[in-house]
Amino acid sequence: KEKKLNLSENFKTFVDKIKVKNEEEENEAKVGNSIVTTLDLELQQVASDALGDNKGSVVAINPKTGEILAMVSKPSFDPNDLGAALEAAYSGSDEETPLINRAIDGLYPPGSVFKTVTLSSALENIPGVANRTFNDQGKIIFDDGTTLNNYAYQSHGAIDLRYAYRVSSNVVFGTLAMELGNSTLKQTAENYGFNSVISGPGLTITASQ
């Protein structure tokens, strides 16, 4: 019985040594393929510094080649401690959601950038709009009772379309949007590529929602 016990222990030790050896061989570092990115380190740093501690993303693309020159998403995480970020994400303890790449996964309203679409639609569909004077009292009330204020609750008084665009008047462009109606404004937006997948070299932009 004693000999059988020793044999069993020796066999177990032998198997354990083989297992450890195999694991060491599997974990040995191997030379991989070289990866060359199009990122500009200096531009990447500038984008990261500009974004600071704010949530959001910054992307710089070469329009001729589609090369991604900079892509920053914040909040970010330490790539050397990915395990901690994954654990926090799975447990739901990190409300900052740093694993979401906001440059490609975020869904955001266009904001005042859309005023350019509204302006284009108004010039095309509202006769004489370029010569009108608008009374900007600082806020506008929509048909459903929703109130939209200007930035910092500013009132601009009697202004023309050019000035309204320069100061990004929510009152004037909200008024124009109501005059145009949903279908007309939607058609203009789609003429500019909204609701369409914009594919090309580098970063593909999915359809708006």
Placement of each model-derived feature along the sequence:
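Extracytoplasmic/periplasmic proteins that interact with beta-lactams or build/remodel peptidoglycan
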Residues: 1-57, 72, 77-102, 107
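Beta-lactam-recognizing serine transpeptidase/beta-lactamase-like catalytic domain environment
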Residues: 22-24, 64-112, 117-209
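Short hydrophobic alpha-helical segments used for membrane anchoring or interfacial signaling
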Residues: 58-63
